[in-house]
Amino acid sequence: MKLSILGARVIDPASGLXXV
């Protein structure tokens, strides 16, 4: 899931924080 968070943070910083 870490990879998804890292990728999401590039697309949308809020998602990375968030963590989704």
From Swiss-Prot:
Q: Which GO terms describe its biological process?
A: pyrimidine nucleotide biosynthetic process
Keyword annotations for this protein, in alphabetical order, are:
Pyrimidine biosynthesis
The disulfide bridges present are none
Q: How does it assemble?
A: Heterododecamer of 6 active PyrB subunits and 6 non-catalytic PyrC' subunits.
Its function, per the record, reads: Non-functional DHOase.
Write out the similarity annotation.
Answer: Belongs to the metallo-dependent hydrolases superfamily. DHOase family. PyrC' subfamily.
Q: What is this protein called?
A: Dihydroorotase-like protein
Per the record, the gene is pyrC'
